[in-house]
Amino acid sequence: MQELYRPEEIESTVQQHWHENDTFKVTEDPCKEKYYCLSMLPYPSGRLHMGHVRNYTIGDVIARYQRMLGKNVLQPIGWDAFGLPAEGAAVKNNTAPAPWTYANIDYMKNQLKLLGFGYDWSREVTTCRPDYYRWEQWFFTRLYEKGLVYKKTSAVNWCPQDQTVLANEQVIDGCCWRCDTKVERKEIPQWFVKITAYADQLLYDLDKLESWPEQVKTMQRNWIGRSEGVEITFQVADSEETLTVYTTRPDTFMGTTYVAVAAGHPLSLQAAASNPALADFIQECRTTKVAEADMATMEKKGMATGLHAVHPLTGEMLPVWVANFVLMDYGTGAVMAVPGHDQRDFEFARKYDLPVKPVIRNADGSEPDLSAQAMTEKGVLFNSGEFDGLDFQAGFNAIADALVAQGVGERKVNYRLRDWGVSRQRYWGAPIPMMTLEDGTVVPTPEDQLPVVLPEDVVMDGISSPLKADPDWAKTTYNGQPALRETDTFDTFMESSWYYARYTCPDYDRGMLDPAAANYWLPVDQYIGGIEHAIMHLMYFRFYHKLLRDAGLVTSDEPAKRLLCQGMVLADAFYYLTSSGERVWVSPLEVSVERDEKGRIVKSTDASGRELVYAGMSKMSKSKNNGIDPQEMVEKYGADTVRLFMMFASPAEMTLEWQESGVEGANRFLKRVWKLAYEHPQQGPVGALDIDALNDEQKALRREVHKTIAKVTDDIGRRQTFNTAIAAIMELMNKLARAPQQTGQDRALLQEALVAVVRMLYPFTPHACFTLWRALGGEGDIDNAPWPVADEAAMVEDAKLVVIQVNGKLRGRITVPADADEALVCERASQEHLVAKHLEGTTVRKVIYVPGKLLNLVVG
């Protein structure tokens, strides 16, 4: 072992050892408890960023810890390799998406290896390869045969920039999540998977996920949006037509004053045929923002159709309006408007001078004041004829029953969740395995024609998909008949919804999954990824697992037992303004800063001396040029230092503020550990530790060692507070550095302590600990060493420090035997000079004793 800590030499040597020995390669072993630790697979964008490093370091720490507990640990990695960015990069770099993607994978794979992550690389999965997506295509055809897949023309979120459909979840503030272009509404044929058929399971099984963050479960519950209500049919006056609405507030039904329908509703289109102004308004609605946040805040617009609906209980004639806040995709595309008790309906009614009728009293029994806003609380009905005086639940039931009895109502459970649109009008994705025959019949691609292989040698023009531009690619046959292949490709969430299961059997070629391997490893024991995936990936991930279960491929109900959502990585951001007012962002690595006495940045300049504006800490991003390249940090400080800083600087689920001074601090700590572990063996052989021969000082130090082991074990295993685990190890190291080394028992105790420190640090800093383990005489490789176990006997304290109070005020501290009872503590306390002084001439009225901690004497 060398005297100085040189990570550049140590880390490459240790990584080579892991590679040559297949250290992290695993197979199913029924005799060992399994543990499947998985971080969300990366998109191969070209380079790792610090968000990746944080995610994968957390996963690696957990995996190595569980391995030291003796478990059979699977930690795989792969590549979510399809996706739109590859198309843009291919056009920009005059290449095709495939070579760009494969080159990125090679580069990023090397970066992952340099960080020392303990992956089983034999299970690497690349989702753009036909041997992966063939099974996705096969499964899709099975879902089609089961009636869980269908095609329909529907209004979709269309990104004109990317020329593709976006899921509702991919529309952020009315714009495309990827390119920030304003989203339009467009009617095109789409393939859908019936996630709504599993809505109840997805909702109720959230209760089984005891080790998932409540925030994620709440977001999923809200997204599924189960509601109980009534579907009501209105007759259109002077017509055979009807329209249907769904409401969760039938108790307010007698307050309905108009009906609003979506621009795409059949009644809207019928009325527009003879009304050019209405036709123009409907066209305007097609570009309306569709994200819910926008729907809530945008200006409410509408136009009367001239039609009227007949109120089924009162016979009142209710005007039918087209409104921009009603969407065909939600419910029935029509809503009953109760402006007295719904704020959106109220705003619309005020704008267009429509009647407002109150039908629910205030909590105090008074009539609501509707001059400024709607009264949306539940209460007792009035102005409602025979239903007057009923409370919410009674009113709900009575009006629902009346509608059902008349044949114009039906109690229904509705969901906010919509079926999953999986069609994308792009090239770089898995081809959808469906065909259209000459007579228009749509059929699934036969199994013997799978996979439908995506051609990789293509020329990108940046506008149309090569699949759509090449008519020959689509031509095929079905049972000897000419047929055309589907030229849409799958949403890339399809690939990332089942990759975790394929890791259990990546080379299996007789089916989608090897049931024996899949059911040995699944469910995932620990899943790690960002909270931003709560309602897209994590919902589809759960849905797909239930589909796999119902196909007989897995036996568990949920894909992952425990979920950890790591926080974002932030860094300082700086910019200057050009003469035109444009912000130019400058990398923090190129900025010199001055700080005040509290460490706050008060001045910043770039290399040319230009003064910059400090924009605070923000998420590392290309747009703000404040990303820190992990590779540069690894080359400067070593992978172990970067890993240690990432785990120490913040609780895992909180945001992490990147500070290079913190990285330097982590590096100094590792050097201290290295120095002590180097110097210790240099002093000669170490004898056996004789626990019975330890003096009080040695016992106290050994107690600290084993209390630290207990704390670190709990922090990593149960609490997952990795930063406090590291802090405890650092605190112990400070004590070890000051510990005497005069006797054989001093040295034997330090040996036990250092070996424990190295084992506890191993999940965080595996390269250094691999080397130190050998230097300290550890048996075999530390990769196969057991986790240290705290000695309960060592943690028992011989004595306790008890705080003494008189009438709640501190009057002294005394040391008593650990097993001292209240009487002994009172006796010792009364002998303390300051305590005795405050007891003089008084009577002890009450004794409050917290064993081993505090004695409070209440006197009078």
From Swiss-Prot:
Origin organism is Sodalis glossinidius (strain morsitans)
Q: What is the lineage of its organism?
A: Bacteria, Pseudomonadati, Pseudomonadota, Gammaproteobacteria, Enterobacterales
- Annotated localization: Cytoplasm
Q: Which domain of life is it from?
A: Bacteria
Its recorded name reads Leucine--tRNA ligase
Q: Which GO terms describe its molecular function?
A: aminoacyl-tRNA deacylase activity; ATP binding; leucine-tRNA ligase activity
The EC designation for this entry is 6.1.1.4
User: Where is this protein chiefly located?
Assistant: cytoplasm
Cellular component GO terms held in the UniProt record: cytosol
User: Motif 'HIGH' region located where?
Assistant: 42-52
An example Pfam family from this entry, by short name, is: tRNA-synt_1g
What's a single GO BP term from this record? leucyl-tRNA aminoacylation
Q: Which gene encodes it?
A: leuS
Q: Give residue numbers for sequence motif 'KMSKS' region.
A: 619-623
Sites binding ATP sit at K622
> What keywords does the record list, in alphabetical order?
Aminoacyl-tRNA synthetase, ATP-binding, Cytoplasm, Ligase, Nucleotide-binding, Protein biosynthesis
Give the reactions, separated by semicolons, that this protein catalyses: tRNA(Leu) + L-leucine + ATP = L-leucyl-tRNA(Leu) + AMP + diphosphate
Q: Which family does it belong to?
A: Belongs to the class-I aminoacyl-tRNA synthetase family.
